[in-house]
């Protein structure tokens, strides 16, 4: 594409990746970055502030895109990953992990679909159950130390995921396929029906948080306007300075 078209800038550079924040991976380390600083410099100097789980899609069955159960399970997954040893991997291992990810995405619903792990070949189902089983101790701890009123939500939600791994018809993909088949419609029609349903749910949701959301939005707009007024530097000069900050 180039950087300019008809004298106007259309890209920051002529590379596929414009800045380091566009380096996409399944899970990406991030840090809140002060204005004008390079994200990679701040990340290296101050460490990881949070992680983005990039490979998680919106839940089409929820009008806000995610359920409480999913939030709890993702917490468990992150904690499980944190407490397990994670040595640096080679390029070859990275390629193998990419193959696993691709196989799960493309063949995850196929009975007997196989992947190659450090322990050898195994089915996607068995590997999923192995990982989920490894989360049980963490779920027990969270139930005992974090949950209120003696609730066992962590273990209960984990148990639900184990049930799903054993019967993929209960997975989101299984529910989606069943809905499409039962309604005898195509995927596009299904998406439109869901969008209308979700709009209806959103329109009838309690407005108790509307005021606070509006206040936050206005604060953000005011802050953006203030930054634009204070920053009078020419964009090309700013870009040259910004791109030259890699340490």
What do these predicted regions represent?
Residues 1-247:
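C-terminal accessory/tail domains of diverse enzymes
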